[in-house]
Regions:
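Conserved N-proximal alpha/beta basic substrate-recognition cap immediately N-terminal to
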Residues: 1-19, 31, 206
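Conserved protein kinase catalytic/activation segment
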Residues: 154-156
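ATP-grasp fold ATP-binding core
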Residues: 20-40, 57-76, 81, 95-97, ...
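Short beta-strand-to-turn element immediately C-terminal to the catalytic PLP-Schiff-base lysine
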Residues: 37-42, 84-86, 151, 175
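Conserved ATP-binding module of the ATP-grasp superfamily
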Residues: 3, 26, 39-76, 106-112, ...
C-alpha cells in the first residue's frame, strides 16, 4: 500500500499532497487509541481531516511532531496481535478480533474478542506477517502490539509498535488468566522467566465511544449489567457533570 507523510503547521488551510488517491486514511505519527485517525474519500474530506488532526496534535502537547501519515485505506476485518519477544524468540500472548466493521470516517475502539475464531492457517499468516515486520525493524526484546486487516488479497499490517495494548484492554489478560500483562512484560525485560497461561475460554472487552457533545447527568443500569452472566467488570470513565 502507498503512504505519504505530510507536515501540518496549523496555519491556513492544509494542502493535499501530490500522489494521494482515495479512499485514504490520515493519522498522526504519534498518539494512540485511534485519536486522529480519519478516513477521507476526496480532497475536501482530506483537507478537513488534516485540519482536525492538526488541532488534535496541538492539544496533545509540544512533544508530538506535527506530522501526519496519509496512507491507502485497506478494507477488511481487523485483528490485533499481542506478542512478546525474548532475545528474538516470539511468543504469542493473544490474537483479538474486532467483530464490528471499522470503515470510518472515524475508527473508535469498540469490541475486542479473543480468540477470534480464525482457522489455524489464517492465524499463521497473521503471525508470520507480524514476526517478519519485527525482524525488518530489528525488534528483539519486549512487547509487541500489532494491528492487521484481512481481505481477499491477504493479510495487511496496519500498525506495529514495541508496546503493550493500550487503555484498559490489558485488564482482560488478568481477568482471563489471573496474570497481569504488565508483570509478564517486566519479568521479560529483567531477563527472568515470564510464564504465561493462555486465556481459558473466550475473553473480551467492549468500549462504548461517545457519539457527540454533551454533559453526563447520570448513568443508569450499571448494577443490572453487573448481574449479567460472564460480565466481570464495568468502568465508567466519564463522571457525571
Amino acid at each position: 500500500p502507498w503512504f505519504i507523510s505530510a507536515a501540518v503547521c496549523g496555519q491556513g488551510e492544509p494542502e493535499v499532497p501530490s500522489g494521494v488517491s482515495y479512499p485514504c486514511v490520515a493519522k498522526p505519527v504519534t498518539l494512540s487509541a485511534s485519536r486522529g485517525v480519519i478516513r477521507a474519500n476526496n480532497d475536501q474530506e482530506l483537507v478537513a481531516a488534516l485540519s482536525r488532526i492538526s488541532k488534535i496534535i496541538e492539544s496533545a502537547g509540544p512533544e508530538h511532531p506535527r506530522v501526519v501519515l496519509i496512507e491507502e485505506y485497506i478494507p477488511g476485518m481487523e485483528y490485533v496481535v499481542e506478542g512478546l519477544l525474548d532475545s528474538g524468540n516470539w511468543r504469542t500472548m493473544a490474537i483479538f478480533g474486532k467483530p464490528e466493521p471499522l470503515e470510518g470516517p472515524f475508527f473508535e475502539e469498540t469490541i475486542y474478542i479473543a480468540p477470534p475464531g480464525l482457522g489455524f492457517d489464517v492465524e499463521k499468516k497473521i503471525l508470520d506477517t507480524v514476526r517478519a515486520t519485527c525482524e525488518a525493524y530489528g525488534l528483539e526484546h519486549g512487547p509487541v502490539h500489532a494491528e492487521c486487516r484481512i481481505n481477499e488479497d491477504g493479510v495487511w499490517l496496519i500498525e506495529l509498535a514495541p508496546r503493550t495494548i493500550g487503555g484498559k484492554c490489558s485488564r482482560i489478560f488478568q481477568l482471563g488468566t489471573g496474570q497481569a500483562l504488565e508483570d509478564i512484560v517486566i519479568l521479560n525485560a529483567l531477563g527472568r522467566p515470564a510464564p504465561f497461561r493462555p486465556p481459558a475460554g473466550v475473553i473480551g472487552v467492549m468500549m462504548i465511544p461517545v457519539q457527540g457533545l454533551g454533559i453526563v447527568r447520570r448513568v443508569e443500569g450499571i448494577e443490572a449489567a453487573r448481574c449479567v452472566d460472564h460480565i466481570e467488570e464495568i468502568e465508567i470513565d466519564v463522571k457525571p457533570g
